[in-house]
């Protein structure tokens, strides 16, 4: 096999090496499949990573020596980012004799398809689950399908199909044993490149120093990780993007390190790896981790990408700010640390110099007496944008609150701390009167706006109710909520 050309995208598809030249860097995987490869089984529904009709599976080398297969949204995934990986589509599953894969046959037998438009996406999400877990629980199935929408079946037969797919005979293609075959890893290793992938308006450095040099040399470039937000600028806003510098090939940014001081999460670590590490440290954050986004989005998007995006309704920032997270910024060889809440200067404005990048986020370890939670209010449980999000951390010394940190999303132009409410809690006992004083102080911290997700009055009163919920949960008491209207 010839060495990879630094201007040619190479990946595996059905055991064959595919080489792609001459396409724009913002060509999506879905666009390539349907318009260039003739693989029309993968559908476009929403073009923003919400509906799951476009789901495919990507395989990439794993530290255990094998290949890890994960579902991703092809509608917002740029083609150069699958260089060196294995692409699996719904057409890949059928056996040479025409027999269906177990996840497909289970969908047929359980009557899991009606109009059929969403079915290929469900099948691919189920394939990723099938390869990962032979006997998934119902809860695990629901998590795996959180990014797939169907408007026909009501989901019950699809969930049944997922539960029973594992009892079918092993398929000729894409069995668990076949996916774990060492030959697949060898085929991916053969695609590994020493030189950076360089396309017009796309550069994928392969070391942290090379990345820092590239960003410093092109401060006008746009840094790209998972494209779960940037992808929409192309598919929905039809934007012409500036040159892209891709973080996903930098080994130093793909690591999570843990020590007595906490977690250090690199800028290219996907959300599907970052959140479990955080939840292992703070189990109370499990719900917001589950609700953050669907598996396909979390398998592409990164925690640092969510931080760097700086949206006032980004769900990671309230929890991280409450935990006292800091970020590491780099320009060339120079690094500096910054408290996460100080990173945001105003709407879409950040303390980020030209040519500087966010290298990592550090989440401090819990301390004795710490209680933490994060609550998200949205119109849907899965795959929805917050109206209000509260991240809260208190440290108890006996019955008194020695320290308190409250951070909100959806209440201001930036993710922000509620410093007046914090002051009302510090040094006080866990009592109803203290809770009410802190809830009232939120009006001094925020003047929220009204929009399509919630009115200003709703946001302020709902924020107070989330504060009441947290503090009453710590005492085991009854939550007395203020009445709110949207």
Where in the sequence are the language-model features?
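S4-like RNA-binding module at protein N-termini
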Residues: 58-89
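Extended heptad-repeat alpha-helical coiled-coils characteristic
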Residues: 92-95
């Amino acid at each position: 096999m010839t060495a990879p050309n630094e201007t040619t995208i190479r990946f595996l598809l059905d055991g064959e090496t595919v080489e792609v030249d001459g396409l724009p860097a913002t060509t999506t995987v879905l666009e390539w499949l349907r318009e260039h490869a003739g693989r029309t089984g993968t559908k476009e529904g929403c073009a923003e990573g919400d509906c799951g009709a476009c789901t495919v599976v990507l395989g990439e080398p794993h530290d255990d020596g094998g290949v890890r297969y994960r579902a991703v949204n092809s509608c917002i995934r740029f083609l150069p980012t699958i260089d060196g990986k294995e692409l699996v589509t719904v057409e890949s599953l059928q056996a040479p004799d025409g027999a269906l894969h177990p996840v497909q046959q289970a969908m047929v037998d359980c009557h899991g398809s009606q109009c059929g438009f969403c079915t290929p996406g469900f099948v691919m999400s189920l394939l990723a689950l099938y390869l990962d877990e032979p006997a998934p629980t119902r809860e695990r199935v629901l998590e795996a399908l959180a990014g797939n929408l169907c408007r026909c079946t009501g989901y019950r037969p699809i969930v049944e199909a997922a539960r029973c797919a594992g009892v079918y005979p092993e398929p000729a293609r894409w069995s668990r044993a076949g996916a774990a075959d060492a030959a697949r890893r060898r085929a991916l290793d053969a695609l590994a490149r020493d030189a950076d992938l360089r396309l017009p308006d796309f550069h994928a450095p392969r070391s942290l120093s090379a990345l820092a040099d590239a960003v410093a040399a092109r401060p006008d470039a746009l840094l790209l990780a998972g494209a779960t937000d940037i992808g929409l600028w192309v598919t929905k806003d039809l934007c012409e993007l500036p040159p892209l510098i891709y973080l996903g090939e930098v080994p130093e940014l793909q690591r999570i390190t843990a020590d007595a001081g906490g977690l250090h999460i690199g800028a290219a670590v996907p959300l599907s790896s970052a959140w479990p590490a955080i939840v292992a440290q703070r189990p109370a954050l499990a719900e917001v981790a589950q609700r953050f986004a669907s598996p396909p989005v979390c398998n592409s998007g990164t925690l640092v990408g969510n931080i760097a995006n700086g949206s006032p309704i980004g769900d990671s920032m309230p929890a991280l700010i409450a935990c006292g997270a800091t970020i590491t910024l780099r320009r060339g060889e120079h690094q500096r640390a910054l408290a996460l809440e100080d990173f945001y200067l105003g709407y879409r404005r950040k303390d980020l110099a030209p040519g500087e990048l966010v290298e990592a986020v550090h989440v401090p370890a819990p301390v004795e007496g710490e209680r933490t939670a994060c609550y998200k209010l949205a119109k849907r449980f899965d795959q929805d944008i917050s109206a209000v999000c509260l991240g809260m951390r208190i440290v108890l010394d006996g019955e008194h609150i020695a320290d308190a940190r409250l951070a909100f999303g959806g209440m201001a132009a930036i993710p922000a701390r509620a410093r007046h409410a914090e002051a009302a809690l510090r040094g006080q006992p866990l009592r109803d009167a203290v809770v009410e004083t802190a809830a009232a102080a939120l009006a001094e911290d925020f003047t929220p706006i009204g929009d399509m997700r919630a009115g200003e009055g709703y946001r302020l009163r709902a924020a107070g109710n989330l504060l009441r919920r947290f503090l009453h949960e710590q005492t085991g008491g009854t939550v007395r909520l203020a009445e709110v209207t949207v």
